[in-house]
């Protein structure tokens, strides 16, 4: 079974993550917490707090709702997370779309105000406890697993988070929703950092897109989600192997990262200096670069 407008909806979720969590990772985690710019920290916090609103608005636009109505129902989920906002916007969006088509002009606006906005918030509120408890439970399991078997956790987390980073999802959104901190978040941050180099080599070897596309994918994989969707096997397999290798190294180096949601190449690397000795971070990052370049090179040979 396929969800209606599934591809467009997932693209909207990725865009919402970029608009909220990516800005938060740069402005709040890096410029704010690491460099000490209070105003920029506020900018990041503002964007991050509206992830649910962004997801609800973008997904309703993606399924064909008029932008004005999409904003109307999207604003109603203010204060909720990205997944509850996304699901509420997606589900209620179809009703709003039907109301647009079948209710006379003028009355459709009143109907959406009276029915659509409250219903969207109600759905988001009902979903929030279930989603939060599920994700936090998973996050707790991963965090405790990092202490009992850090190498295995490095393989699982490093591989999985890097694959999610290249999918039409968001590693930032995933790690933020799971509430990962400590070693698991360090694995996520530096594994994704290493994947930039891996994917640059892989794209070049497989001749996927132009040089501009290669650079864009290396900086932020979500920008080239269409290329990933067209070539899933080589990209996902190579990224899992490279991410797992980086995860093992990071686990062995015992790095930590107490800023959730920083599984993004540049900000993820930068924020590591706030919680670990500089030399240790640089050595580990260099190791991740080498492992990732090797994974990208051999992945390009295998799948060429």
Each model region followed by its residue ranges:
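Pore-lining transmembrane helices
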Residues: 1-304
């Amino acid at each position: 079974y396929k969800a209606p407008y599934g591809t467009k909806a997932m693209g909207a979720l990725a865009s919402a993550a970029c608009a909220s969590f990516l800005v938060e990772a740069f402005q709040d985690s890096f410029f704010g917490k690491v460099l000490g710019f209070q105003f920029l920290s506020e900018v990041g916090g503002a964007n991050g707090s509206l992830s649910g609103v962004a997801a609800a608005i973008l997904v309703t636009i993606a399924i064909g709702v008029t932008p004005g109505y999409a904003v109307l129902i999207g604003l109603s989920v203010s204060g909720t997370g990205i997944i509850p906002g996304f699901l509420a916007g997606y589900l209620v969006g179809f009703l709003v779309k039907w109301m647009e088509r079948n209710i006379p002009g003028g009355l459709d606006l009143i109907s959406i105000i009276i029915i659509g906005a409250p219903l969207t918030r109600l759905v988001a509120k009902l979903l929030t406890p279930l989603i939060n408890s599920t994700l936090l439970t998973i996050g707790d399991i991963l965090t405790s697993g990092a202490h009992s078997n850090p190498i295995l956790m490095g393989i699982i987390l490093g591989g999985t988070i890097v694959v999610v980073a290249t999918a039409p999802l968001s590693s930032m959104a995933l790690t933020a929703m799971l509430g990962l901190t400590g070693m698991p978040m360090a694995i996520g941050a530096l594994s994704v950092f290493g994947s930039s180099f891996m994917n640059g080599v892989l794209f070049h070897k497989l001749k996927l897109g132009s040089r501009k596309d290669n650079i864009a994918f290396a900086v932020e994989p979500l920008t080239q989600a269409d290329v990933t969707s067209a070539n899933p096997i080589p990209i996902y397999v190579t990224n899992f192997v490279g991410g797992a290798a980086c995860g093992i190294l990071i686990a062995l180096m015992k790095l930590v990262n107490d800023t959730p949601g920083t599984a993004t190449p540049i900000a993820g690397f930068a924020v590591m200096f706030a919680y670990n000795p500089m030399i240790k971070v640089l050595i580990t990052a260099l190791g991740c670069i080498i492992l990732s370049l090797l994974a990208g090179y051999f992945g390009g040979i295998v799948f060429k």
